[in-house]
Structure formats: structure tokens, C-alpha cells
Swiss-Prot record:
InterPro entries: D1/D2, Photo_II_D1/D2_sf, Photo_RC_L/M, Photo_RC_L/M_CS, PSII_PsbD/D2. Chlorophyll a ChlzD2 binds at H116. Its EC number is 1.10.3.9. GO terms for molecular function: chlorophyll binding; electron transporter, transferring electrons within the cyclic electron transport pathway of photosynthesis activity; iron ion binding; oxygen evolving activity. Fe cation binds at H213, H267. Chlorophyll a PD2 binds at H196. PANTHER family: PHOTOSYSTEM II D2 PROTEIN, PHOTOSYSTEM II PROTEIN D1. It catalyses: 2 a plastoquinone + 4 hnu + 2 H2O = 2 a plastoquinol + O2. This is Photosystem II D2 protein. It comes from Trichormus variabilis (strain ATCC 29413 / PCC 7937) (Anabaena variabilis).
Length: 351
């Protein structure tokens, strides 16, 4: 009789690491976690450090930290000075030369937070893709999350790369983002840009669809008893459907004369509207980075210049944009030492 003794195949370090990363634990790590967790930690830590201690005096001539008296709405990690160009401002680079204090003064925390934040968001998207594959579902969550990533990358990275320096990127703070919005309007007439319109339609349309869908499901929950509440419908172990798609279809058919006939098309539409809107707005921001113009109704501007009694909402907005540029530029870019004489400041046709 012959006895064959089997030997377990040897496992390499990659297999061991793969098993450890994908082990079932309270917080899943995975291969995506190698990118996500360090980058998210460093981005958040850099932002908290900057908003707590670091001034923007040397980059924007502003106070921007809790230490200087700013509050949650006015603190920011500000973008570097215009003179820094598109330098990555590495701590060990020629600008800071390993001096941490000088690095903070030059605005080194901004590219640190921006790049680690971008890679952290990408890591989170890859995390959704990885877990979806392990669980055995489609990766549409990752696809949906690509939309805010596209907006972040286009606004914080692509736009300033198309301009003269990182200075023109938004700083990381609430009031700083508002300043950036005013800048986009004044210098690019962003609200009249069709890509911005598609973005607004996507975000508000997605919110509307979400509200309508949630209300419709609540309205058509199957009744569990005589009571007014139907909380047993939230039991995750129930085998039957929670709500009636047929009843919902009948309701909206009576409201609009048309309704979604199946859940797949309904939920795909809820995915498509906001994701497409955000992607289109990201494309529009890349266009602004290249200083592309959108709608210019020159005929209206020429007629308004010739006829003091002719003015449209478009020509009024053009005057407002001129005002933003004229009054914002000296405050926003003090290093340029702009001086605008009174006669070139914008005046409305009625003045």
C-alpha cells in the first residue's frame, strides 16, 4: 500500500498580507485602507493644525486661526502666496529648507492638505469598490462617489494649475470658500456658465428626487396592524416588501400623468441626476482654469452702452461683476498693489 503525504502549499508574504488586510474586523482595512487611512489622517490633521495655529499674514495678509481670534466660520488653511507659483512646497524643499515654522508661514500646509485630501477621497472610493467586490454587489457606490471627487480635484487642483499659482485656489475654510465663489463670479461670470447650471440642476434635482422618493416610500408602507405607526416595517428580517410600488405608481400617475414603472429605472435616475450634474460642474471648472468664456451677449452690452435707458439683467450682472473685480482685487491680491482711480470704477446706467 502506498501512502502519499500531502504538504500544504507554502504561502508568500503577499498572501499573508492580503489575508490580514481583508480580515473581518470592526473597521475594514483592505488594500484601499493603505491609501485611505494615512492620507485622511494627515489631511485632517494638517487642517486642524493650520486652523488652530497658523496665520495667513504672510500669504494673504489675513488672520485665519483660532490663535489669532478667528472663529469656526472664518478660520482657514490658506493657499500659498502668488510668488510661490505651483511649487509643491515640500518641507525639505528649497523654499522652507526643513524649517517647519517657515514652511507654515509660506503656506506649505495648503498643498499638504489638498494632495492628501485628494488621495484620501480616492482611497475612500476604492474602499467602496473593494468592499463591493468582496460582498458581491455592483460598484455603483464607488461610481457615485467619483462625482464629488471630480469636483474637489477640479476646484482645488485643476483650476489653480490653469491659473498663475496655487494662490488662486480656494483656501480650506468656510468664509474662504465664500470668497472663492465671489471670485469665480466676478472674474468668470460663473453663474451664467451652462456647466454651472447643469451642476445646480443636478444637486437640487437630486435633493428633490431624494425627498420625493423618501416621502413616497413612507406613504406606501404596508400596514402592519390597526395602529397609526408602522415601525415593524423597519424590521430588517422581514421577508416581504416594505412598501407598494404599484400604489406609488398609481399615485404619481394621477399627479403627473406619468410615473416610474420599475424600481431599477427609478433608482438609476436618482443616481444619474446628481452624479451627472457634479461631473458637468467639474468640467466647467476645468474650462474656467483655461479662462474659457461661456455666454457673452455682446449685442446687449453694446446697446446698453449706447442707450442709457436700455438695461437687462445680463448687463446689470456684467456691471456687478466689474464691481467685484475692481473692489475685490486690491483686497484679495494686496501683493499686486492695485490702485483704481475713481473714474474707472463701475457705475450703473442709472447713476
Amino acid at each position: 500500500m502506498t501512502i502519499a503525504v500531502g504538504r500544504a502549499p507554502s504561502r508568500g508574504w503577499f498572501d499573508v498580507l492580503d489575508d490580514w488586510l481583508k480580515r473581518d474586523r470592526f473597521v475594514f482595512v483592505g488594500w484601499s485602507g493603505i491609501l485611505l487611512f494615512p492620507c485622511a489622517f494627515l489631511a485632517l490633521g494638517g487642517w486642524l493644525t493650520g486652523t488652530t495655529f497658523v496665520t495667513s499674514w504672510y500669504t494673504h495678509g489675513l488672520a485665519s486661526s483660532y490663535l489669532e481670534g478667528a472663529n469656526f466660520l472664518t478660520v482657514a488653511v490658506s493657499s500659498p502666496a502668488d510668488s510661490m507659483g505651483h511649487s509643491l512646497l515640500l518641507l525639505w524643499g528649497p523654499e522652507a529648507q526643513g524649517d517647519f515654522t517657515r514652511w507654515c508661514q509660506l503656506g506649505g500646509l495648503w498643498p499638504f492638505v489638498a494632495l492628501h485630501g485628494a488621495f484620501g477621497l480616492i482611497g475612500f472610493m476604492l474602499r467602496q469598490f473593494e468592499i463591493a467586490r468582496l460582498v458581491g454587489i455592483r460598484p455603483y457606490n464607488a461610481l457615485a462617489f467619483s462625482a464629488p471627487i471630480a469636483v474637489f480635484v477640479s476646484v482645488f487642483l485643476m483650476y489653480p494649475l490653469g491659473q498663475s499659482s496655487w494662490f488662486f485656489a480656494p483656501s480650506f475654510g468656510v468664509a474662504a470658500i465664500f470668497r472663492f465663489l465671489l471670485f469665480l463670479q466676478g472674474f468668470h461670470n460663473w453663474t451664467l456658465n451652462p456647466f454651472h447650471m447643469m451642476g445646480v440642476a443636478g444637486v437640487l434635482g437630486g435633493a428633490l428626487l431624494c425627498a420625493i422618493h423618501g416621502a413616497t416610500v413612507e406613504n406606501t408602507l404596508f400596514e402592519d396592524g390597526e395602529g397609526a405607526n408602522t415601525f415593524r416595517a423597519f424590521n430588517p428580517t422581514q421577508s416581504e416588501e416594505t412598501y407598494s410600488m404599484v400604489t406609488a405608481n398609481r399615485f404619481w400617475s394621477q399627479i403627473f400623468g406619468i410615473a416610474f414603472s420599475n424600481k431599477r429605472w427609478l433608482h438609476f435616475f436618482m443616481l444619474f441626476v446628481p452624479v451627472t450634474g457634479l461631473w458637468m460642474s467639474a468640467v466647467g471648472i476645468v474650462g474656467l482654469a483655461l479662462n474659457l468664456r461661456a455666454y457673452d451677449f455682446v449685442s446687449q452690452e453694446l446697446r446698453a452702452a449706447e442707450d442709457p435707458e436700455f438695461e437687462t439683467f445680463y448687463t446689470k450682472n456684467i456691471l456687478l461683476n466689474e464691481g467685484i473685480r475692481a473692489w475685490m482685487a486690491p483686497q484679495d491680491q494686496p501683493h499686486e498693489k492695485f490702485v483704481f482711480p475713481e473714474e474707472v470704477l463701475p457705475r450703473g446706467n442709472a447713476l
